[in-house]
Amino acid sequence: MGLPIITHYENRQQFLSSLENNPGLIFVKFGAEWCEPCKLIEDDVSRHFLSMPDNVQCAIIDVDNSLDVYAFLKSKKITQGIPTIICYNKGNTHYAPDDVFSGTDKNQLAQFFKRCLDEL
């Protein structure tokens, strides 16, 4: 069993602090309870997150509950909408991620996870 899934960032400082403590990879999925496209990939994302090795930290963030972090990343053109998953490699302590997935294409989602995990 991997690390517990993070479900909330109080603010962007807490988010950036998590990057400094990156165990190997960090995946952050941004979505919302009301988001229909988010629901389309929810099971696939959960399956991937639950099968991660111990050096991968995952977060499932509701944009309505972590608005500071989402708005900050959106202002930097990191996220354009939801669902979006961003990936940070160990050593990247900057807000710009190493890889990004946005949308609902399940094949592209699987390729995104494979591509990121190949960097471990």
Give residue ranges: language-model regions.
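Short amphipathic alpha-helix with an adjacent loop that forms part of the alpha/beta core around
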Residues: 17-19, 70-77
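Eukaryotic short linear interaction motifs
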Residues: 36-37, 67-69, 94, 108-110
